[in-house]
């Protein structure tokens, strides 16, 4: 069973529906016992980094996630991926879950082409930089769906894939059993 971690933000039910379409049993939960009993974890998210970390902390889920990710696969999606990093500079400086070495920074100031819109919203080609089982069903250059204004930076050792948005934008990361995708896999494929 997959536990979709519910901390009050995110695309929880569209994600659960996508997993059901793939024949995967999933439950949306904030219950630590259910999270501990799950085989795999997904940390979704839409919104601001600081608010999301505050909600995870207030619900007592930070230590549960950190402990369980040592034993089973964890996938962070969009903001969920960003939360995997050491810190973020979204509306101040905030500590993250610390699985991925690096930081989450605003996309706009780093863009080489200042005419590009932020947030990056829409389809972009994914370029695989490290082979990984995560890409078993994703081909090099396949288009994936993004909606974000911040991105993972200074994380080369964990970066699995990037997309070009006048700069290489981190598309997927991995550290041990912990994976993250900045793009939305539940909106990107069949």
Name each model-derived stretch.
Residues 2-24, 183-187:
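N-terminal beta1-alpha1 ligand-phosphate binding loop
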Residues 21-28, 56-59, 125-129, 162-164:
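Short gly/ser/thr-rich secondary-structure transition/capping motifs
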Residues 26-37:
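Short acidic low-complexity segments
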Residues 36-45:
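Short acidic/histidine-rich motifs immediately flanking catalytic phosphotransfer sites
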Residues 47-122:
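Cysteine-nucleophile active-site neighborhood
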Residues 70, 103-190:
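Amide-donor transfer/coupling interface in amidating biosynthetic enzymes
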């Amino acid at each position: 069973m997959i536990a979709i971690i519910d901390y009050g933000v995110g695309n929880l039910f569209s994600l659960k529906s996508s997993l059901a379409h793939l024949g995967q049993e999933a439950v949306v939960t904030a219950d630590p016992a259910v999270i501990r009993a799950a085989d795999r974890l997904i940390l979704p998210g839409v919104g601001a980094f600081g608010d999301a970390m505050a909600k995870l902390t207030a619900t007592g889920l930070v230590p549960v996630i950190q402990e369980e990710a040592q034993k089973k696969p964890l996938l962070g999606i969009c903001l969920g991926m960003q939360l995997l990093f050491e810190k973020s500079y979204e509306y101040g400086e905030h500590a993250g879950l610390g699985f991925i070495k690096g930081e989450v920074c605003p996309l706009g100031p780093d863009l080489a082409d200042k005419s590009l819109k932020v947030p990056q919203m829409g389809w972009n080609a994914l370029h695989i930089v490290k082979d990984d089982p995560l890409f078993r069903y994703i081909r090099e250059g396949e288009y994936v769906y993004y909606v974000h204004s911040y991105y993972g930076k200074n994380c080369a050792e964990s970066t699995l894939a990037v997309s070009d948005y006048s700069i290489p934008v981190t598309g997927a990361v991995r550290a041990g059993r912990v994976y993250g995708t900045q793009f939305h896999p539940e909106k990107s494929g069949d």
